[in-house]
């Protein structure tokens, strides 16, 4: 099976009941849009597969070991690089983002841009939206400055 298609199947299964912050949109559309953005810059199937899978370890019970077994070291290493424990502060996330490899940075930049696009429809209080927008703007600047 094609690596990108396999990644899409895994993402659909892993995020099957999850919704975006609007409470309506299937979550799996997010990693697929991230991968679409990434594919405008690279045709490397490992990188595109990692873009599709960038949230599966962070948000589900999928493991890096399983991804390594199904795919390869490149896909698993990229997903691992992008996986940040939820308890990490935003300041620490900025520091980590500056250390990303070029392909992880490409994925994270598309992830942040997609989250920014979706922000207006999020079912959140205005204060939370404003705070998250500020975080995403700063993250995008950090990713672009490296």
Segments and roles (model prediction):
Residues 1-146:
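Active-site helical microenvironments for divalent-metal-assisted chemistry
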């Amino acid at each position: 099976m094609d690596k990108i298609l396999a990644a899409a199947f895994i993402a659909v299964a892993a995020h099957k009941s999850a919704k975006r912050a609007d409470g309506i949109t299937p979550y799996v559309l997010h990693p697929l849009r991230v991968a679409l953005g990434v594919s405008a810059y690279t045709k490397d199937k490992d990188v595109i597969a990692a873009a599709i899978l960038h949230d599966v370890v962070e948000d589900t019970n999928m493991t890096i070991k399983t991804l390594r077994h199904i795919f390869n070291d490149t896909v698993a290493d990229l997903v691992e690089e992008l996986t940040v424990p939820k308890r990490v502060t935003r300041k620490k996330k900025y520091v980590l983002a500056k250390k990303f490899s070029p392909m992880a940075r490409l994925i994270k930049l598309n992830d942040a841009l997609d989250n920014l696009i979706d922000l207006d429809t999020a079912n959140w209080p205005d204060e939370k939206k404003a705070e998250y927008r500020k975080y995403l703007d700063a993250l995008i600047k950090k990713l672009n400055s490296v």
